[in-house]
A protein has these predicted regions:
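A short LG(V/I)-centered, amphipathic sequence patch enriched
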Residues: 40-57
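Alpha-helical residues within the helix-turn-helix
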Residues: 23, 41, 115
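C-terminal regulatory
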Residues: 135, 147-260, 287-298
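Residues within the DNA-recognition helix of helix-turn-helix
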Residues: 28, 35-38, 109
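Short helix-boundary/capping micro-motifs
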Residues: 11-26
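Central regulatory/effector-binding core of bacterial HTH transcription factors
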Residues: 90-150
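Conserved amphipathic alpha-helical core elements
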Residues: 39-40, 247
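Short helix-loop hinge/linker segments at domain boundaries
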Residues: 52-55, 59-62, 73-96, 295
Length: 298
């Protein structure tokens, strides 16, 4: 196997589909598919499971991708050591993140990362879902809670808190509860329960075991906008609600804390673009650390 075959295979592994990889490489999809079939034949191993909606790596494919990424990392480190044009960080890094953090905090700051590394293409996927790092749905994921399984590298990004909020208009029209049990007489805004992809995201039960949402939205930013519009009382991230004068705190002595973690597959350890992106994430959060955690006011 030559490096060109390896480069093409890595593109497919990272894109998770032939079409996306072919577009990124600037070649025909049929040509790429033939090259992958020829690579499998030359190695005598099945590397890809081809599905209608993309490709999944087999166990042999995972092993090959890990080996190629280590070789790629060594090559990039050698280029950086000896200088020249090769020392510039380049390539594509895909960051998956919850929509609240991804849209409201990270997206407005990505220009700074791009200015720092002009050769780097940054893809942000800010959607409320679990990302499969082994299937290359993202290179880096910002997760709620530390993953317990998989060949993953994880480091804590920051704690964050959530509190109850309502709009000023809602408070004027309906009043506010004095205890959590008083929430039963109010319209509540929360997640679509069967779409909650991690137990740690079931915030509402942490505030009141009897919580029953009358308006359910599968997006943190969507819930924020609904609460601001007077839809009811909802659990909001304090860093999203901060500074919004149209919101009032409800039961301000009740606070729930969670943590964001930076996670990536161990096969990506040492890659310059991964180091650049994770370093930037930590730097951006540290610069505004005070906004993520609110102490109880009770």
């Amino acid at each position: 196997m030559n490096w060109e075959d390896g480069r093409l295979f890595l593109a497919v592994a990272r894109a998770g589909q032939m079409l996306g990889a072919a577009k990124a490489l600037g070649i025909n999809q049929a040509t790429l598919s033939r090259r992958m079939s020829a690579l499998e034949a030359s190695l005598g191993a099945s590397l890809l499971i081809r599905r209608t909606n993309g490709c999944e790596l087999t166990e042999e494919g995972e092993a090959l991708a890990a080996s190629l990424e280590r070789a790629e990392a060594e090559l990039l480190q050698a280029q950086a050591r000896f200088g020249g044009a090769g020392s510039e960080i380049s390539g594509t890094v895909r960051i998956g993140a919850p929509d609240g953090f991804g849209v409201s905090f990270l997206a407005p700051r990505l220009a700074h990362l791009s200015d720092r590394h002009p050769g780097l293409t940054i893809q942000l996927v800010p959607v409320p879902q679990a990302f499969s790092l082994s299937k290359r749905e993202a290179d880096i994921a910002v997760m709620v809670g530390r993953p317990e399984q998989g060949r993953l590298v994880a480091s804590k990004l920051t704690d964050y808190t959530l509190s109850l909020y309502a709009s000023r208009d809602y408070a004027d029209r309906h009043g506010l509860p004095e205890t959590t049990d008083g929430l039963r007489s109010h319209r509540l805004v929360g997640y679509v329960e069967d779409l909650i992809y991690a137990p740690t995201l079931n915030y509402t039960a942490s505030f009141w075991s009897g919580w029953r949402s009358r308006i359910e939205i599968s997006s943190a930013t969507g819930q924020l906008e609904a609460v601001r519009a007077g839809a009811g009382i909802g659990v909001l991230h304090d860093y999203l609600a901060a500074g919004r004068n149209d919101l009032v705190s409800v039961l301000p002595d009740v606070v729930v804390q969670r943590a964001y973690w930076i996670v990536y597959h161990e096969s990506l350890r040492g890659l310059a673009r991964i180091k650049a992106a994770t370093g930037f994430l930590n730097e951006a959060v540290r610069a505004e650390a005070g906004r993520f955690v609110r102490a109880p006011r009770g």
